[in-house]
Regions:
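Substrate-binding cleft of secreted/luminal carbohydrate-active enzymes
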Residues: 171-177, 419-493
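Substrate-binding cleft of extracellular glycoside hydrolase catalytic domains
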Residues: 210, 214-351, 356, 360
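Acidic, Ser/Thr/Gly/Pro-rich low-complexity segments and short DxT(G/T)-type signature motifs
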Residues: 24-43, 108-135
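Aromatic-lined carbohydrate-recognition surfaces of secreted/lumenal glycan-active proteins
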Residues: 175-176, 314-316, 347-377, 419-428
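Aromatic- and acid-rich polysaccharide-binding/catalytic face
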Residues: 202, 379-401, 448
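Short, surface-exposed alpha-helix to beta-strand junction/turn motifs within ectodomains of secreted
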Residues: 49-82, 109-112
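C-terminal motif of bacterial Sec signal peptides marking the signal peptidase cleavage site
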Residues: 14-17
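N-terminal module-boundary/linker segments of secreted carbohydrate-active enzymes
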Residues: 132-205, 209-218, 433-434, 488-493
């Protein structure tokens, strides 16, 4: 029996030794896992016709070209480019339309890792939608018929009514004086063309110096209003602006007050650290300073009102749009350095003080935008509001005399056509006939003074911003049938 059992055992061992070995089961490594997506899944309100989607995985990945061809998007859009680098899969999508909803699909296995015996990725579906964009419809110019100040003087109302009447028919000629209290540019244009510009511009640039001490050869005295009186008496219109000089520090202010030294004053951002935000806060020296300056300007404007002279008033110019376009300080002038909101607050403060506190009813308020490329996108953000602005203007310095349709339409669109529009400053004069032919209903143009190093007015060309204002072109413009000169103006008294 014992021998039999041993035999059976031996036979079993023999049979077992003849069987094939069993291969061990090896599990595949997990495929790459999606960690994040930019934009995030479900994002709404995207803009543009193209989109770059970046999918980030938990490991370095690859996406072979045959797998890239399987990535798809619906809704009529198309896949433009697929790129796998390190942990990121970048997909560029084209042909997106406003208001559309889309699903971008990366099929299972399209994204692969670099580990041996590894699964591909799971299917990824990325959904997003585009902002519905209403078709652009340009606004038509249909200005309101009244000034924002309900107590506006009779003369101011007369001027505004005249501008309304001429809108789309003719444009007024205008020049900026190179001095605060002289009609030097007007006289130079007249001497050459035989016609006076209808609009004369003056500037409170030298407010701190006024009045200069007796005996100075350089005289600044805003109490002398003989130039605007002469202009108004001859049926011309009067425009004032304000390059608002401010002190860099309280010490600079004190130095100006005590020693008549204004070396520490400026209006350019890169030359003063004066902070508009501090100026809007009561209790700061900056606030005390601007309130004193406003009071002083109000006194000079009152002299004009006492003579029944209406003033086209254009302060805080060129703030709109240039806060991110000029220099390391972020603005051209200090009133635009810290963005739109403080600037709008300052405009409203200035309006309240001059109209409601000092009772100036002779002002027609002009808000000026900047023409720097790309600035149009910012216009509305900076606009103080219809209740504080009568007319909107743009300062244009261009190496041509073509109609400025882009700038014109941007201004009209900003107020939905509710405000008159003007070329509030220019170098080369936009050709009035070309402007009218293009449908640009500019109320006036204001040529900036082109002067030599001694301050003498030049009608001859200088740099590219003025070089087309030749003697011949001045005569052409001042004789243009679409231009109103001072000789053509009615009495608006």
């Amino acid at each position: 029996m014992k021998k039999l059992l041993l035999g059976i055992l031996g036979l079993g061992l023999l049979l077992a030794g003849c069987q094939e070995p069993v291969e061990p089961v090896v599990q595949k490594a997990a495929g790459p896992k999606l960690v994040s997506c930019d934009p995030t899944d479900g994002t709404q309100g995207l803009t543009g016709s193209e989109l770059t989607v970046k999918m980030t995985f938990d490991q370095n990945i690859k996406c072979p070209s045959d797998k890239q061809a399987l990535i798809s998007i619906d809704g009529g859009a198309s896949i433009g480019n697929v790129n796998a680098y390190m942990t990121d899969l970048t997909i560029k999508v084209f042909g997106l339309e406003g208001g559309g909803s889309y699903v971008l699909t990366v099929p299972a296995g399209a994204v692969q890792g670099y580990r041996p015996n590894q699964e591909g990725s799971e299917e990824v579906k990325f959904t997003f939608s585009m902002k519905k964009v209403e078709p652009y419809v340009p606004s038509d110019l249909d200005p309101v018929k009244t000034l924002v100040n309900p107590k506006a003087s009779k003369e101011a109302r007369n001027v505004y009514s005249f501008l309304l009447e001429q809108s789309g028919k003719k444009t007024l000629s205008g020049v900026q004086s190179s001095h605060s209290h002289k009609n030097d540019f007007i006289d130079a244009v007249y001497q050459h063309t035989g016609k006076h510009p209808a609009l004369a511009g003056y500037d409170f640039l030298f407010l701190q110096f006024s009045p200069t001490p007796a005996g100075w050869s350089w005289v600044q005295n805003y109490n002398d209003i003989s130039a605007p009186k002469e202009q108004w008496a001859a049926n011309g219109l009067v425009n004032y602006m304000w390059h608002w000089n401010v002190p860099n520090s309280k010490a600079d202010w004190d130095n100006g007050v005590n020693n008549y030294n204004f070396d520490g004053y400026n209006f350019y951002c890169d030359k003063t650290s004066f902070d508009i935000r501090e100026a809007l806060m009561e209790g700061t020296w900056q606030h005390d300073f601007i309130m004193k300056d406003i009071e002083e300007v109000a006194g000079y404007l009152q002299l004009l009102e006492d003579e029944n002279i209406p003033v086209i008033w254009r302060p805080l110019h060129e703030a709109a749009g240039n806060y991110n376009l000029y220099g390391p300080n972020g603005a051209w002038f200090w009133w635009g350095r810290h963005g739109a909101e403080p600037c709008k607050q300052l405009w409203k403060l200035l309006y309240d003080q001059l109209v409601n506190v000092y009772g100036l009813d002779n002002l027609i308020w002009v808000w000026t935008v900047d023409v720097t490329a790309g600035a149009e996108d910012q216009y509305l953000d900076w606009y103080p509001g219809d209740e504080y602005v009568d007319i909107v203007g743009v300062d244009i310095y261009a190496p041509d005399t073509e109609a400025k349709t882009r700038q014109y339409q941007a201004l009209v669109d900003m107020t939905k056509g509710k405000k008159l529009v003007t070329v509030s400053e220019c170098g080369n004069i936009p050709d009035p006939s070309k402007c009218m032919a293009a449908g640009n209903k500019w109320s006036w143009f204001m040529v900036w003074p082109n002067a030599d190093s001694n301050g003498n007015i030049l009608l001859t060309p200088s740099d590219n911003n003025f070089n087309l204002n030749t003697y011949a072109y001045w005569k052409q413009v001042m004789s243009d049938p679409y231009v109103i000169n001072r000789e053509d103006m009615p009495s608006l008294k």
